A protein has these predicted regions:
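Cysteine-dependent deubiquitinase/ubiquitin-like isopeptidase catalytic cores across multiple families
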Residues: 1-173
Length: 173
């Protein structure tokens, strides 16, 4: 099933504007993208929103005072969304497993979609993305360098892909 909508940011998390943290902060960017759904539905996100998410994901990463890739337990439990709005992060469950060529991402993810959450973080081969949802649609946010089809490219941008079914989601490293 094809992607219904593509939004691209101005750059990606590995951009030199992020300095020494460039390329390290995908987990924080993904976390911030889930929090950002509380103030703006991903169906209305535009280029500026993706840039805002990258900038704030980088800001969160820099507050952790590390220069390494993060795992979920390393993430903060509170996020400053705007100057006065703090969001509590609730990691309902951590599930670990293996994906192989026979794995169906939609069926694996579908078991974790519920009406009391608005997104999840997916860590595959060391790369973190977020899967977001509304009542009707599913979205894949990726802070890495992607082209307008969601494929890896050295000169790409962060991306938000929209699907009408979780089974349509494909995750490419």
């Amino acid at each position: 099933m094809p992607c219904l909508k593509v939004v691209q940011g101005s750059n990606h998390q590995g951009n030199e504007k992020f300095g020494e943290t460039a390329g390290m902060q995908c987990t924080c960017c993904s976390l911030f993208s889930v929090a950002f759904t509380l103030v703006k539905s991903p169906g209305y996100w535009d280029r500026k929103d993706l840039d805002f998410i990258l900038d704030n994901g980088d800001r969160i990463y820099k507050t952790l005072n590390t220069l390494r890739y993060l795992m979920f337990p390393d993430l903060p439990r509170q996020i400053l969304l705007f100057e006065t709005q703090v969001v509590q992060v609730d990691f309902k469950t951590n599930k670990f497993g293996f994906l192989n060529s026979q794995s169906v991402p939609g069926s694996l993810l579908g078991r974790n979609v519920s009406s009391d959450t608005n997104g999840l973080l997916l860590l595959v081969r060391g790369l973190c993305v977020s899967v977001l949802w509304t009542k009707r649609d599913f979205y894949l946010f990726d802070s890495h360098s992607k082209n307008d089809k969601g494929e890896c490219t050295p000169d790409g941008c962060s991306i938000l892909l929209k699907f009408n079914s979780i089974n349509a989601l494909g995750v490419e490293g």
